[in-house]
């Protein structure tokens, strides 16, 4: 499988990105190099290798999930530029085509 300029254009459109022609060619080339590397990795024979999820034993250092006091909804709404009932209104970013 190889990535074409048309593939880059399609994904860019989905992500709402724009690239010039040189960037499209460069991205297609970079993505093809990545795919070639992944293909090489898939050729490796790992049947005799031990499964290692994590080579180091790392203990979870995160705190426990506990409910803590937070800012009140009224305070949030007072600081928002626009609100509707208990929602903060934000500018539209994505519109239907």
Swiss-Prot record:
Which top-level group of life is the source organism from? Bacteria
Under Enzyme Commission nomenclature, its number is: 6.3.5.-
The function of this protein is: Allows the formation of correctly charged Asn-tRNA(Asn) or Gln-tRNA(Gln) through the transamidation of misacylated Asp-tRNA(Asn) or Glu-tRNA(Gln) in organisms which lack either or both of asparaginyl-tRNA or glutaminyl-tRNA synthetases. The reaction takes place in the presence of glutamine and ATP through an activated phospho-Asp-tRNA(Asn) or phospho-Glu-tRNA(Gln).
Q: Which NCBIfam families match?
A: gatC (TIGR00135)
Q: Which GO terms describe its molecular function?
A: asparaginyl-tRNA synthase (glutamine-hydrolyzing) activity; ATP binding; glutaminyl-tRNA synthase (glutamine-hydrolyzing) activity
- InterPro entries the UniProt entry points to: Asp/Glu-ADT_sf_sub_c (IPR036113), GatC (IPR003837)
Q: Name one GO biological process term.
A: translation
Keywords of the record, alphabetical order, are:
ATP-binding, Ligase, Nucleotide-binding, Protein biosynthesis
**Quaternary arrangement and interactors, per the entry?**
Heterotrimer of A, B and C subunits.
What Pfam families does its record include? GatC
Which organism's genome codes for this protein?
Clostridium botulinum (strain Eklund 17B / Type B)
List the catalytic activities from the record. L-glutamyl-tRNA(Gln) + L-glutamine + ATP + H2O = L-glutaminyl-tRNA(Gln) + L-glutamate + ADP + phosphate + H(+); L-aspartyl-tRNA(Asn) + L-glutamine + ATP + H2O = L-asparaginyl-tRNA(Asn) + L-glutamate + ADP + phosphate + 2 H(+)
The record's similarity note reads: Belongs to the GatC family.
Q: Which SUPFAM superfamilies match?
A: Glu-tRNAGln amidotransferase C subunit
Q: Does the keyword Transferase belong to this entry?
A: no
Q: What is this protein called?
A: Aspartyl/glutamyl-tRNA(Asn/Gln) amidotransferase subunit C
Q: What PANTHER family has UniProt attached to this entry? A: GLUTAMYL-TRNA(GLN) AMIDOTRANSFERASE SUBUNIT C, MITOCHONDRIAL
- Gene behind this protein: gatC
């Amino acid at each position: 499988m190889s990535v074409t300029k048309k593939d880059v254009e399609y994904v860019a459109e989905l992500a709402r990105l724009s690239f010039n022609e040189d960037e499209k060619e460069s991205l297609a080339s970079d993505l093809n190099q990545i795919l070639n590397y992944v293909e090489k990795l898939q050729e490796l024979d790992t049947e005799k290798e031990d499964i290692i999820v994590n080579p180091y034993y790392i203990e979870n250092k995160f705190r426990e999930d506990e409910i803590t006091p937070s800012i009140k909804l009224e305070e949030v709404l007072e600081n928002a530029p626009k609100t509707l009932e208990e929602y903060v209104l934000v500018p539209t970013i994505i519109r239907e085509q």
